[in-house]
Amino acid sequence: MDIQEINQSSPEFLYQMLGRLEVDCLYYLGNGGRFAGHLWAGNEREQIKLMWMIYRRLCEIGAAPEWMSEQQINDFAEQMLVV
């Protein structure tokens, strides 16, 4: 998924996708044994990058999710060693 696809997607889809990416991160850090194959994007860096792109797009269109914050994405990045 690239920035063009993100910009063309509905807010509903972006919420769903961001939620999916969050759940993948939680599983990766927990029962997933830190296996990158469990991540939608296939690796840690791309997963976090995609989360940022979606989050920023939602903020741009005035639809920032109440259940996700910049700090949470940063925390995932630190825990997944991509900072």
Regions found by a protein language model. Name each.
Residues 1-12, 65-67, 75-83:
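Short intrinsically disordered terminal tails
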Residues 22, 44, 83:
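Functionally constrained cores in energy, signaling, and assembly domains
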Residues 29-31, 51, 82:
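Extended rod-forming repeat segments used as scaffolds/tethers
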Residues 2-39:
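N-terminal acidic leader/helix
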Residues 35-79:
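Short, charge-rich amphipathic interface segments used for partner binding and complex assembly
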